[in-house]
């Protein structure tokens, strides 16, 4: 479906839960979030019906997110059913990787073709600090389980934070030489009030490229990421800059929260409820959300301070 500004909307990000087994500082409060009543969340059948309605409007790609989607007990069933919806060509999933030793192969068999894994640091102590409770050893176990499951593509996402991991740009990028993965550096966005990070946390991508003098532009399309390549590497380096160089003009996505709200923009207060609707009702709301998609996200700091809604774990990134 084409939105008001001529963009083809083909990508739906689906948050299946707000809950997580980690507490990453830029994503959610230290105490987590209050678990909502089961009746307030989309059921599996409602979620699949929403995917069917989205596919009827031209959505072809799904990304399953959270929270942490792998804490959802029926995550494999959700992925299997979503991958079989007519019109859906690709089902991807974003995870912290901790539960992949048990779930990587079942997810691949259920139709998930691509994985994004969160990895902000290679230092075990810093990993425990940023996640508030995670173990880097557990991450690597999940990562290798994903490699063994032979997904079509694996990407590692690192949120750049000044004074925390800006000294690890090269070591993180070097993972593309060791493994057949992409490493993507993501600008810090003003989302979570409890993060404790100030303006100094923002890292311009000129500093990333300065830390990677060997990197050359890669010709391959990276979607929202600007791609670079290290000589001899097995994967690419991506730079995602929603703050300094927003990609609103090419944005092709909408988001569905775990409690059944469609968000036309990550940084907008606008939400279109789907919970309790039949197929036609969901389709109408999805169409309204697409037509209500703003031309650009505006000033992110202003949007954040005005309460653009939710912490990142409640939206799905």
Regions found by a protein language model. Name each.
Residues 1-11, 178, 188-317:
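Auxiliary Fe-S-binding modules of radical SAM enzymes
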Residues 22, 124-125, 246, 272:
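Glycine-centered loop/turn positions within well-structured domains
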Residues 41-64, 71-186:
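Radical SAM/AdoMet-radical enzyme domain recognition
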């Amino acid at each position: 479906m084409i939105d008001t500004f001529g963009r083809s909307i083909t990508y739906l990000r689906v948050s299946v839960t707000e809950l997580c087994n980690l507490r990453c500082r830029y994503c959610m409060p230290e105490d987590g979030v209050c678990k909502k009543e089961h009746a307030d969340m989309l059921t599996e059948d409602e979620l699949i019906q929403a995917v069917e309605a989205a596919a009827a409007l031209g959505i072809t790609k799904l990304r399953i997110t959270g929270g942490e989607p792998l804490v959802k007990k029926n995550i494999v069933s959700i992925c299997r059913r979503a991958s079989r919806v007519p019109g859906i060509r690709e089902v991807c999933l974003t995870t912290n990787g901790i539960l992949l030793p048990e779930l990587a192969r079942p997810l691949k068999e259920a139709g998930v073709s691509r994985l994004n894994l969160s990895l902000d640091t290679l230092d075990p102590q810093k990993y425990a600090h940023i996640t508030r409770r995670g173990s880097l050893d557990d991450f690597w176990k999940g990562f290798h389980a994903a490699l063994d499951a032979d997904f079509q593509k694996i990407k590692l996402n690192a949120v750049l934070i000044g004074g925390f991991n800006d000294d690890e740009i090269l070591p993180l990028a070097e993972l593309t030489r060791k493994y057949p993965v992409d490493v993507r550096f993501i600008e810090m966005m003003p989302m979570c009030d409890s993060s404790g990070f100030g303006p100094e946390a923002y890292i311009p991508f000129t500093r990333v490229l300065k830390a990677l003098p060997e990197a050359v532009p890669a010709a391959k399309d990276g979607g929202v990421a600007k791609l670079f390549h290290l000589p001899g590497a097995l994967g690419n380096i991506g730079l995602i800059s929603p703050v300094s160089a927003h990609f609103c003009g090419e944005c092709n996505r909408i988001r569905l929260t775990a409690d059944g709200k469609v968000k036309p923009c990550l940084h907008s207060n606008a939400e279109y409820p789907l919970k309790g609707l039949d197929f036609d009702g969901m389709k109408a709301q999805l169409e309204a959300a697409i037509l209500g998609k703003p031309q650009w996200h505006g000033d992110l700091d202003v949007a954040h301070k005005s309460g653009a809604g939710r912490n990142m774990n409640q939206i799905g990134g």
